[in-house]
Swiss-Prot record:
It comes from Geotalea uraniireducens (strain Rf4) (Geobacter uraniireducens). Residues 206-209 are annotated as: Aspartate. Keywords: Aminoacyl-tRNA synthetase, ATP-binding, Cytoplasm, Ligase, Nucleotide-binding, Protein biosynthesis. Homodimer. NCBIfam families: aspS_bact, PRK00476.1. L-aspartate binds at residues 182, 228, 455, 496. It comes from the Bacteria. GO terms for molecular function: aspartate-tRNA ligase activity; aspartate-tRNA(Asn) ligase activity; ATP binding; nucleic acid binding. This is Aspartate--tRNA(Asp/Asn) ligase.
Length: 593
């Protein structure tokens, strides 16, 4: 028989009981995590979001409560009233927050039953992710996921407190907006009232937050949902959350200073970690030169080494010809990996090929010197110069790629991260931040044969590079900045264009006709004509930030109801077909291929 609450009020969370509560009468409510019979006594681990409490049913203390406890099974919903007592000698559980106490039950209510579970809720049990997502309401009861989401809530609270304390206003921007596709595809929402027309769900609040700056709200923020209809990867979701900020009458230094304070506050209050301020900075060019990527992981070395000048006249034609053709030769020193087998090196070669490398040359450093198929092609002077550049020692493994600069940097940069993971160099408890600055403003899209924005079309060029936007676009640097943590970009921002003339020029450089720019962005251009202030901002990816704070392997473990890599919610079975009546109201029909 299921009981009603009958006016009972919870006095404590299960996981909040301490030795200071001994002697108190308490009312606890939660789920039966585990039940054990011990010689007439029944022990139940009662669980809620704060943790576990051991409750004891003694037939001598309360026969009625003990009788009810006999029917309790895992995940039954239970309320108990009882007295907090110390655990007997030898039974204290130092691994449990409530491990010094237990509750001797005087009354019990069974508030609901549960079917047999499709999987156990212990954190250490490996369960197929699709099964977990299908029964997400059960999966979310697991302590590790509850801790992740509680921390997520805490980060959002810290963010609001910090930003409002620094003069920011929390303002909302629309979810039903105009489609202005740049990069990823928009999610489209058909309008019932305006047949044949569509809203788009925002990929970011970018345009509206800039218009808020034009409107005089000089410090804005929002913890906001964004949407992108793109092919999904392990760390991407079609809907995601940003901490979105914008400021007026500022420069890059103002934004970076305020945001460093936010990040430091978050890490201090959630991890007890000190973020040393100011956070180090590195230009985009330096990052590419040293690490091959614009989001370097600074927890380990394995820096890339430029070798083009050393090998440009070498007898090894593969290297020399690449340099002569405008390419580069780089390498990295996998310290202590000289004992790798040929198969292991072949696996590294195949990995590098994923990112465009045609091959991976290698040298094993032995007591006799270089051991490599390419050793015979180099002079003693060239070998000595490379040894010095690599700081090569006996037992090291030197790896080389020769190709176009982009291929070399991409493949070696990714290989660097791959090696670090396989060598156990990634400490999840170490947090290494770096600002990457001075990005290129534009990059040439070889497929589309046009210039594309490296960040987005609203990023301002460096003042000293403005004159080159039309004449030499590849030379222009942007007033852009990314915050990188352990190789993950957790925030990206820029100073924005605030003059209509420059914004129109940017659209022109991106291949928009004047008419097309007006159709898509006319409201922004119009706003700029009415006294737009200098402004800039940043957006932090909340999901990825929480993933790093919790040490989670998947972004899906820090989102309450995530989608699969196919964009599906297995629990609610979305997306789904809709009936013809709904389609007719929208003036739509489906086309079956």
């Amino acid at each position: 028989m299921i009981d009603f609450l009958g006016g009972w009020k919870r006095t404590h969370y299960c996981g909040a009981l301490t030795a200071g509560d001994i002697g108190k009468e308490v009312v606890l409510m939660g789920w039966a995590h585990r039940r054990r019979d011990h010689g007439g006594l029944i022990f139940v681990d009662l669980r809620d979001r704060e943790g576990l409490a051991q409750v004891v049913f003694d037939p001598d203390n309360s026969p009625a409560a003990h009788k009810k406890a006999e029917a309790i099974r895992n995940e039954y919903v239970v309320a108990i009233r009882g007295k907090v007592i110390p655990r007997p000698d030898g039974t204290v559980n130092a691994n449990l927050k409530t491990g010094e106490v237990e509750v001797l039950v005087s009354e019990c209510k069974m508030l609901n039953r549960s079917k047999a579970l499709p999987f156990t809720l212990d954190d250490y049990v490996d369960v197929a992710e699709n099964l977990r997502l299908k029964h997400r309401y059960l999966d979310l009861r697991r302590p590790v996921l509850q801790e992740n989401l509680i921390l997520r809530s805490k980060v959002a609270q810290i963010t609001r407190q910090y930003l409002t304390g620094n003069g920011f206003l929390e303002l909302e921007t629309p979810f039903l907006t105009k489609s202005t596709p740049e990069g990823a595809r928009d999610f489209l929402v058909p309008s019932r009232i305006n047949r044949g027309e569509f809203y788009a769900l925002p990929q970011s609040p970018q345009l509206f937050k800039q218009i808020l700056m034009v409107s005089g709200f000089d410090r804005y923020f929002q913890v906001v949902r964004c949407f992108r209809d793109e092919d999904l990867r392990a760390d991407r979701q079609p809907e995601f959350t940003q901490i979105d900020c914008e400021m007026s009458f500022i420069d890059r230094e103002d934004i970076i200073t305020v945001m460093e304070g936010l990040i430091a506050r978050i890490f201090t209050e959630t991890k007890g970690a000190t973020v040393n301020l100011p956070i180090p900075r590195m230009t985009y060019a330096e990052s590419i030169r040293r690490f091959g990527v614009d989001n370097p992981d600074l927890r380990f070395g394995l820096e890339l080494v430029e070798l083009s000048d050393i090998v440009k006249n070498a007898g090894f034609k593969v290297f020399a010809d690449v340099v002569a053709g405008g390419g580069i030769v780089k390498g990295l020193n996998a310290k202590g990996c000289g004992g790798m087998s040929r198969k292991e090196i072949d696996d590294l070669t195949e990995f590098a090929k994923i990112y465009g490398a045609k091959g991976l040359a290698y040298v094993k450093m032995t007591a006799e010197g270089w051991q490599s198929p390419i050793a015979k092609f180099f002079t003693a002077e060239e070998i000595s110069a490379m040894d010095k550049a690599f700081d090569a020692k006996e037992g090291d493994l030197l790896l080389f790629v020769a190709d176009k600069p982009k291929v070399v940097n991409d493949s070696l940069g990714k290989l660097r991260n791959h090696l670090a993971k396989s060598l156990g160099l990634l400490d999840k408890d170490t947090f290494n931040f770096v600002w990457i600055t001075d990005f290129p403003l534009l990059e040439w899209d070889e497929e589309e044969k046009r210039w594309a924005a490296v960040h987005h079309p609203f990023t301002a060029p460096m003042d000293e590079d403005l004159e080159y936007v039309e004449s030499d676009p590849g030379r222009c640097r942007a007033k852009a900045y990314d915050l990188v943590l352990n190789g993950n970009e957790i925030g990206g921002g820029s100073i924005r264009i605030h003059q209509e003339k420059i914004q129109s020029l940017m659209f022109k450089m991106l291949g928009h006709s004047e008419e097309d720019a007006r159709t898509k962005f006319g409201f922004l251009l119009d706003a700029m004509d009415y006294g737009a202030p200098p402004h800039g901002g940043i957006a932090f990816g909340l999901d990825r930030l929480i993933m790093l704070l919790t040490g989670s392997d998947s972004i899906r473990d820090v989102i309450a109801f995530p989608k699969t890599q196919k964009g599906a919610c297995l629990m609610s079975e979305a997306p789904s077909a809709v009936d013809m009546k709904q389609l007719r109201e929208l003036g739509l029909k489906t086309v079956v291929k």
